[in-house]
Amino acid sequence: YTVLCDFLTDNPGQYVADKFYLVSTTDKDAVLEVAQKEKVNGVLAYASDPAAPTAAYVGEKLKLPTNPYYAVDILCNKDRFRAFLQDNGFNAPVSMGYQTIEDAMADTSRFRLPVIVKPVDSSGSKGATVLHSWDKVNDALEFAFSFSRAHRVIVEEYIEKKHPYLIGGDIFVLNGKVVIWGLLNCHRDTRVNPLVPVGKSYPLILEEADVQLVQQTLQSMMDKLGIRFGSVNVELVIDKNNRVWPIDVGPRAGGNMIPDLLGKIYGADLVEMAVQAAMGQPILTTVHKPDGCYATHNLHSTKNGIYKQIVFSDELKKYLQEVHFYKKPGDHVERFDNAAKCLGIIFMKFPDVATAENILSHMEKHIDVQLTTE
């Protein structure tokens, strides 16, 4: 029996849930009231940061299985997360949180360029901008504030990575220990926004010694936060001095169907595992040794318009496993400057890494997003 809460009237989950409440997942007490009324046995936030503190809050109030509210709250607030990193011996960029544009503008001398400006409480790179000069700092701050529910932004020095792709994906924690290392390459499209994820691929292109450093960092973080179970979405980089820098860590599964991709790689149902953990049930899923060469790509447009169709090249069609469209002809399409403007997603399986790299590095040649003018 599944109860779903959301403030969006068009949430597609309402058609498969047993009960739907038009309640915002950020309204902790309203969700608690629903949970009490329905006498739920577990509560789970999925694929988005804002609902995660609510799930932990309700879990603690009703004495249900949950990760500590204080830990979840740290992970969902970027300035608190940066403070946690600094206080616990992890690498953290020079950063500062602000509640007004004026305060941030007056404090730029604190930082070395490039910097990244972003809301403290958003995910999917919504509201984030990288600045290589201070010329457009006002625009970047206004953009970041427009995506912050708490009306608070963070400015931090931007860490340059030594490897080709940001390290991302999901890990799965059971009894405090990471049991699935779903680390993936994070792909970007610099034509639209170098910060917004456009896809993931596996296997991870990283030296084994660096993989070990990443794993040690994440397990240590789970220990210090007291994270006991569930999916944790991660983003990290390693700099030229071989230092691991955690960029974002979210106490929930990743968006863009990351659990589905990891399911193919590990032969395990990570969604089922997350639900079982949240219910306090034993996890009986068999997790296989990771195998294969897989990728996802978020279908997107470089401009605004009216959706007509998306055409794939014959070469790409050889490797397509699944295609999911979110738009239909006639729908309005916006330039892909944040993850919410995705047009759909495709899953691919390749025979080897070389083939995957060849296709994934030239996706604009293999996908034709056809629009009509507005």
What do the PLM-derived regions correspond to, one by one?
Residues 299-331:
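Glycine-rich active-site loop/lid that clamps phosphate-bearing ligands
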Residues 129, 139-144, 156, 165-187, ...:
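Beta-strand scaffold of nucleotide-dependent catalytic cores
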Residues 1-71, 102, 280-284, 301, ...:
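ATP-binding N-terminal substructure of ATP-dependent carboxylate-amine bond-forming enzymes
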Residues 212-234, 240-241, 250-305:
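Active-site "cap" helix and flanking loop/linker of ATP-utilizing ligase/carboxylase catalytic domains
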Residues 60-127:
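A conserved helix-loop-beta module that forms one wall/lid of the active-site cleft
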Residues 98, 128-133, 172-174, 239:
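Short beta-strand-to-turn element immediately C-terminal to the catalytic PLP-Schiff-base lysine
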Residues 129, 157, 203, 263, ...:
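Short, well-ordered beta-strand elements within core beta-sheets of diverse protein domains
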Residues 91-93, 114-117, 129-165, 194, ...:
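Conserved ATP-binding module of the ATP-grasp superfamily
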